[in-house]
Amino acid sequence: VYRNPIPNEPTPAHLAAIEREQRLLEAEIALVDAEIRFLTAEPAPTQLDWRRLRRAQNRVLREMVALVERYLRSIDEVA
């Protein structure tokens, strides 16, 4: 029915992409965890909750920048 059936397993290219983005994915998961803790803090978020949230946000930004820099370096190497 399908000309190119959807593979059941990730391709090597997909695995390589996941590996390249792994640190960003981990940072984003930590950010979601910090956001959940912040939003569910009783009776209100503490200074520690605020600090945890800021650190998680900053980590995501650092990892995004690092990922873009690695990508740009790889383009320069090809050119």
Which role does the model predict for each range below?
Residues 17, 24, 31, 48, ...:
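Alpha-helical initiation/capping and key positions within long helical/coiled-coil segments
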Residues 38-79:
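Short, compact, well-ordered microdomains
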Residues 25-39, 63:
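Non-transmembrane amphipathic alpha-helical segments
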Residues 1-24, 65, 69-79:
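Long, non-catalytic architectural segments outside compact domain cores
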